[in-house]
Amino acid sequence: MKKFTCVQDIGDLKSALAEAFEIQKDRFKYVELGRNKTLMMIFFNSSLRTRLSTQKAALNLGMNVMVLDINQGAWKLETERGVIMDGDKPEHLLEAIPVMGCYCDIIGVRSFARFEDRDFDYQETILNQFIQYSGRPVFSMEAATRHPLQSFADLITIEEYKKTARPKVVMTWAPHPRPLPQAVPNSFAEWMNATDYDFVITHPEGYELAPQFVGNAKVEYDQMKAFEGADFIYAKNWAAYTGDNYGQILSKDREWTVSDRQMAVTNNAFFMHCLPVRRNMIVTDDVIESPQSIVIPEAANREISATVVLKRLIEGLE
């Protein structure tokens, strides 16, 4: 594997899942694989689970790890071509990227959507600059449009907990006080569409995701109807995608907060969320603290998904 930015990069999902469950049983099975290999993790945005789980995955494989927080201990970086650099950014990303590539074997990049220009975001400008100019395999630790490490962990979790071969999985929008990127819901939809699950997306009108991510999923604007008979509920906020509303909050309707009321019509569904979660905005205390909440095992599987991805990237170096 030469890069990891979307579900297509992982190849056959059954094979990837088999590898994930193998690593779950013995996390240090491939500890010699990464000997004398260096991972560089580059963060343009904050992180808890991604930072810790990816570092742990690299250690599982015997790698050296370097972490760089852009704009915190490093020069501020200009990201756009054609800019007259007479401001507070003394270095351009197009010089910084190949320099970073000199010091490592694999690069992970975390760079969120800015919500200033949809084309800039959805062209994955920053991530693709790393792919083009670093000379190293690059993987996404959440980019403007996708969060594949999270989605792979979500898939592992569903496969662990499902009680039927073809579960009903519902991704629901929920309110949040701040506008959040579409990366997690886009990516989750992309990965669910790559399975044979019964996959439903529910959200208020105006929160439609980009068609290439919705794919063949059923879109239901009635949340209660969408929840009926569900085996898994995946809650997530996202800002508007369409038109002039891109990046905006259109609603904070707490009727969409996942509570016992909605969960009562499910098939005793498991509750999932990528974390961090705003309690009593996204989900009530009772639901996230219930026995059906699997947000912690879901987070634990971030280490597993990252280990599989790094293992395959290392193997691709040979």
Swiss-Prot record:
Q: Which GO terms describe its molecular function?
A: amino acid binding; ornithine carbamoyltransferase activity
GO annotation terms (biological process): arginine biosynthetic process via ornithine; citrulline biosynthetic process; L-arginine biosynthetic process
Reactions that this protein is recorded to catalyse: N(2)-succinyl-L-ornithine + carbamoyl phosphate = N(2)-succinyl-L-citrulline + phosphate + H(+)
Q: Which Pfam families match?
A: OTCace, OTCace_N
Against SUPFAM superfamilies, the record matches this protein to:
Aspartate/ornithine carbamoyltransferase
Which Enzyme Commission numbers does its entry carry?
Answer: 2.1.3.11
Annotated binding of carbamoyl phosphate, by residue: 47-50, 75, 110, 147-150, 274-275, 302
Q: What class of enzyme is it?
A: transferase
Where in the chain is the site Key residue in conferring substrate specificity for N-succinyl-L-ornithine versus N-acetyl-L-ornithine?
A: 90
Which pathway?
Amino-acid biosynthesis; L-arginine biosynthesis
Q: Does the keyword Plastid apply?
A: no
- What are the UniProt keywords, alphabetically? Amino-acid biosynthesis, Arginine biosynthesis, Transferase
Positions contributing to N(2)-succinyl-L-ornithine binding: 142, 176, 236, 278
Regarding protein family, the annotation reads: Belongs to the aspartate/ornithine carbamoyltransferase superfamily. SOTCase family.
Question: Subunit info?
Answer: Homotrimer.
Any idea what job this protein has?
Answer: Catalyzes the transfer of the carbamoyl group from carbamoyl phosphate to the delta-amino group of N(2)-succinyl-L-ornithine to produce N(2)-succinyl-L-citrulline. Is essential for arginine biosynthesis. Has no activity with either L-ornithine or L-aspartate as substrate. Also has no detectable AOTCase activity, being unable to convert N(2)-acetyl-L-ornithine to N(2)-acetyl-L-citrulline.
- Please state what the protein is called: N-succinylornithine carbamoyltransferase
